[in-house]
């Protein structure tokens, strides 16, 4: 944020529900996408920068709510398939298949999607503005392949494979790439 502020950008930043300084105990990408949509419509940014599940949620909301005032997107460490994330949690938390299936049904009933249907690469097909997708090959949270899967379907995507930063991608190298992309006409 500070490097962009020094370049005189106006910054609007939000934390996901149940993350950082936000209230709540429930987080879903769909719930987050609604907050992102509201924020975008309130402030009308020209450039949107989103990280991790925030990037997935931004891609999802923009696929059905095209905002013509947005000129560019930057997606940092975005997951592609919710199924990959959920399988990781399934393994990490050692919950059984019936818990996974119950969660899958809950998501379908509450948000209209099964886990396997929630894919950024599918939603990204509808985003036709210049977009920078950045990922680190050794990201331990989100598979590196997600970058290529999303970019392959996004008409104006540019990818950048970071050599630093892991999943957070908070390094000077990435900051420089984001600034260079943002400043490009």
Sequence positions of predicted segments:
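Hydrolase active-site cap/lid region
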Residues: 65-111
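Alpha/beta-hydrolase active-site loop
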Residues: 24-45
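Gly/Ala-rich beta-loop-alpha elbow adjacent to hydrolase catalytic centers
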Residues: 49-58
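Short alpha-helix in the alpha/beta-hydrolase fold that links the catalytic acid
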Residues: 120, 129, 143-152, 174
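Short beta-strand/loop motif that positions the catalytic acidic residue
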Residues: 126-128, 133-135, 139
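Conserved alpha/beta-hydrolase
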Residues: 1-21
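Catalytic histidine-centered segment of alpha/beta-hydrolase-like enzymes
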Residues: 165-175
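Acidic catalytic loop of the alpha/beta-hydrolase fold
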Residues: 137-142, 167-168
């Amino acid at each position: 944020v500070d490097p962009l502020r020094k370049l005189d950008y106006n910054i609007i930043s939000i934390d996901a529900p149940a993350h950082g300084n936000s209230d709540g105990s429930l987080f879903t990408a769909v719930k987050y996408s609604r907050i992102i949509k509201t924020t975008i419509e309130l402030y009308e940014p020209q450039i949107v920068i989103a990280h991790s599940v925030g990037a997935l949620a931004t891609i999802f909301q923009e696929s059905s709510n095209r905002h013509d005032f947005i000129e560019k997107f930057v997606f940092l460490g975005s997951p592609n398939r919710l199924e990959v994330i959920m399988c990781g949690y399934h393994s990490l938390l050692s919950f059984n298949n019936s818990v996974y299936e119950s969660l899958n049904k809950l998501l379908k009933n509450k948000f209209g999607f099964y886990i396997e249907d929630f894919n950024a690469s599918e939603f990204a097909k509808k985003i036709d503005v210049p977009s920078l997708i950045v990922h680190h090959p050794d990201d331990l949270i989100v598979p590196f392949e997600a970058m290529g899967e999303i970019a392959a379907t996004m008409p104006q995507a540019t990818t950048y494979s970071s050599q630093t930063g892991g999943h957070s991608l908070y390094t000077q190298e990435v900051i420089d790439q984001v600034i260079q992309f943002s400043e490009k006409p």
